[in-house]
């Protein structure tokens, strides 16, 4: 099984889980941000040594609260690639509407060349209005009519940008005329003639896999048709199974079928301990800080009430609800094996990405989590952690 890691890139937060501290009342200085980066360097070396395939990082901006403080995943991933041997570095996710699509295409291509094909690209539409508006786009901010219109514009922008990126990567010359992007712009003079097309410099030296999160019905239909790999996170079992199978159905419909479990990734939040009590004692604060921070964005709306009914958009689950519904893992080695085995059997799972980055864990505790999963959970599950060889020319030295 391919096993990856995912980090939100959170500053050290020893008081995580304190119910009297609201997420927006937190404010951290630049020293705390730099300490997060130092932690990521250390954790990348651990992940590399233990055989994790890819370390995925998360893009966000202007987050004084300290939860997600890495604005450029390609740049930092390229740095980590220079400090590790085999680990791939991925972006989970580049917030595409907040980028100029041609700059994103250039930056990824250059980083992939420099690192010898060890970069993985993930693309998303974004979730945070503070970022989106400040960086020139819009994003939905809740479950209401205004958000629906913002979501429509955001989706259009994203899909056009992805068309531009793929044209630029794989066509020697390209032009594009859409609702939101026109390349080249009309009427550009250049050395005695007019510019009718563009050529991206550089291009990737390989066909690039593109990963995208799948949640909404529209995205479920878009991702397989666009040729992207699907990433699933924080879904109840019924919803997860339906979306997982729908991806394969669409691939079959368009004449590009997939094997069971192929081209789909399950992200699982996990904190394990030698005993269930130890895991709960140390994992509960991080779980509660994580859910408290993300609940206003609707991240846990896939949870269900005991009677099976839907929860509110801004639902904030307890750790017991997360564990009972198998949406997150906080428990013993055996608990983790049981839950991962459930998902493996349900989905024919081949690609697992573990989110270790519950707020409040120290550098040493995070390293311990990666060791426990690689050395105890996966062997007990009967799975070998398979790291893929690169399929690109060697890194530039």
What residue ranges belong to the model's regions?
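A conserved active-site cap/scaffold subdomain adjacent to cofactor or substrate pockets
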Residues: 213-239
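Conserved, mostly hydrophobic/aromatic
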Residues: 51, 59, 80, 111, ...
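N-terminal beta1-alpha1-beta2 module of alpha/beta enzyme domains
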Residues: 1-87, 207-208, 391-397
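Active-site mouth loops of central-metabolism enzymes
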Residues: 22-37, 94-102, 204-215, 270-273, ...
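Hydrophobic faces of well-ordered beta-strands that scaffold small-molecule active sites
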Residues: 3-7, 55-57, 88-91, 119-123, ...
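Alpha-helix-loop-beta-strand connector modules within alpha/beta enzyme cores
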Residues: 67-91, 157, 371-385
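Acidic (Asp/Glu)-rich catalytic clusters
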Residues: 48-49, 79-85, 108, 112-118, ...
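An alpha-helical appendage that flanks or caps ligand/catalytic pockets
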Residues: 4-28, 142-199, 239-349, 382-397
């Amino acid at each position: 099984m391919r096993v990856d890691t995912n980090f939100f890139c959170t500053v050290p937060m020893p008081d995580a889980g304190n119910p009297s501290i609201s997420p927006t009342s937190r404010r951290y200085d630049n020293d705390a941000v730099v300490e997060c980066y130092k932690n990521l360097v250390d954790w990348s070396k651990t992940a590399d040594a233990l055989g994790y395939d890819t370390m995925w990082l998360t893009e966000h901006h202007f987050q004084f609260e300290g939860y997600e403080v890495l604005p450029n995943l390609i740049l930092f991933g390229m740095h980590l690639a220079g400090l590790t041997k085999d680990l791939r570095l991925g972006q989970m996710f580049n917030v595409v509407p907040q980028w100029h699509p041609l700059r994103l295409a250039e930056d990824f291509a250059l980083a992939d060349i420099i690192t010898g094909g060890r970069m993985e690209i993930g693309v998303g539409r974004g979730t945070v209005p503070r970022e989106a508006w400040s960086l020139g786009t819009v994003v939905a901010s809740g479950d209401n009519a205004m958000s629906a219109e913002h979501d429509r514009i955001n989706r259009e922008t994203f899909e056009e940008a992805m068309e531009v990126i793929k044209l630029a990567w794989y066509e020697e010359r390209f032009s594009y005329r859409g609702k939101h992007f026109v390349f080249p712009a009309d009427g550009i003079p250049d050395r005695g003639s007019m510019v009718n097309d563009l050529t991206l410099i550089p291009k990737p030296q390989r066909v690039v896999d593109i990963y995208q999160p799948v949640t909404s019905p529209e995205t479920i239909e878009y991702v397989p048709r666009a040729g992207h790999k699907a990433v699933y996170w924080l879904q109840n079992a019924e919803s997860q199974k339906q979306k997982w199978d729908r991806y394969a159905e669409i691939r079959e419909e368009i004449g590009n079928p997939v094997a069971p479990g192929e081209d789909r990734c399950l992200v699982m939040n996990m904190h394990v301990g030698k005993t269930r009590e130890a895991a709960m004692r140390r994992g509960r604060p991080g779980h509660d800080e994580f859910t408290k921070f993300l609940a206003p964005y609707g991240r846990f709306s896939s949870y269900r009430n005991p009677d099976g009914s839907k929860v509110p958009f801004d639902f904030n689950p307890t750790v017991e609800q997360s564990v009972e519904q198998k949406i997150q893992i906080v428990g013993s080695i055996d608990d983790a094996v049981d839950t991962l085995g459930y998902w493996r059997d349900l989905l024919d799972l081949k690609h697992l990405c573990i989110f270790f980055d519950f707020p409040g864990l120290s550098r040493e505790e995070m390293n311990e989590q990666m060791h426990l999963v690689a050395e105890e959970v996966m062997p007990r599950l009967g799975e070998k952690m398979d790291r893929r060889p690169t399929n690109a020319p060697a890194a530039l030295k």
